[in-house]
Amino acid sequence: RKHNISMHLEDDLLMANMDARLIIQVLVNLINNAIKYTPENSNISLNARRVEDKILIEVQDDGNGVLHPDQLFEMFYTENNHSGDTRRGMGLGLSLCKSIVLAHGGKIWVENVKPHGACFKFVLDAVEVKLYE
């Protein structure tokens, strides 16, 4: 499947106390879901920026959006709005993402984007780094 994936990172150095392997797994899962739930040639973007004392990371797509955002992170919950991908998940990926983000003291949620699409967001505590001391 072909998709247009873009990434926008804030110019500043973004640092957080985290297990990088686990947070990468969260990102991989969110991007894989965006690919699975959007038609071919859709746009998917990964954005990261600082918001006050947090780092906000977003994975946004221009697919059909989310039918039940309040249930999406529950274990074994799946939605039936695949766009051309017939693989059916077990409903564990987003639940695992939530567990990982919560274990890091963060928060994860999803918002529908008008006119179409979904934006998965999570925040982690930012860490101040002084490079020239």
What are these regions (language model features)?
Residues 93, 97:
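Short alpha-helical Gxxx[C/S/T] motif in the catalytic ATP-binding
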Residues 66-77:
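Short conserved segment of the HATPase_c
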Residues 34-35:
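Short helix-loop "hinge" at the ATP-lid/N-box region of the Bergerat-fold HATPase_c
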Residues 77-88:
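Glycine-rich ATP-lid/hinge loop adjacent to the conserved G-boxes
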Residues 41-53:
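Short beta-strand/loop element within the Bergerat-fold HATPase_c
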Residues 4-14:
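Conserved catalytic submotifs in the C-terminal HATPase_c
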